[in-house]
Regions:
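Generic detector of short, well-ordered, non-transmembrane alpha-helical segments enriched
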Residues: 27-28, 97
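Active-site and NAD+-binding cores of ADP-ribose-processing enzymes
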Residues: 1-16, 38-155
Length: 155
């Protein structure tokens, strides 16, 4: 429920201006980590936070059994940084009653992401792996898996 109730115009996303929430997910744990690293870096670069292990992230595993709108062919919705066109597309699809959308990841070529507009369009997820991200003052350079203790370099 969190993505649907803790939305803010101060934290817009690819397919929302922040006035409504979207549950974003990747088709694999690797995609989800890559996407969250990108957004965490963007957030951290706007803060005076010193380098260190700054934030924990939990993988949530769920499933979707709904028809989602494929937006890969819509002009400009896959731009890696400018979300203007994708926010217009998301608003229009949600307003038309779409359950959600799917697209190719901007962070991991060949992988897919989904955005779900409504809480009842996804199963209640269960927690998977738990990560901590290391901020070096410029970017996320390492992630630590809590369950294994492994520290992985981010390239």
């Amino acid at each position: 429920m969190a993505p649907f109730v803790h939305c803010s115009t101060g934290r817009p996303g690819r397919f929302t201006d922040g006035s409504y929430g979207i549950y974003y997910a990747g088709d694999s744990e690797e995609v989800a980590v890559a996407e969250t690293i990108h957004h965490h870096q963007k957030f951290m670069s706007s803060t005076p936070q010193p380098p260190g292990w700054t934030s924990d992230f939990r993988v949530l595993v769920g499933s979707v059994d709904r028809a989602l709108d494929d937006v890969n062919a819509v002009p400009d919705v896959l731009h890696p940084h400018d979300y203007t066109a994708s926010q217009v597309e998301g608003h229009g699809l949600r307003g038309a009653g779409s359950d959600g959308l799917l697209w190719n990841s901007a962070r991991m070529p060949g992988q897919r992401c989904i955005g779900i507009f409504w809480p009842n369009a996804i199963t209640i997820p269960v927690q998977g792996r738990h990560y901590c991200y290391h901020w070096n003052g410029t970017r996320v350079d390492f992630v630590r898996q809590y369950d294994t203790g492994a520290v992985l370099a981010v390239t």
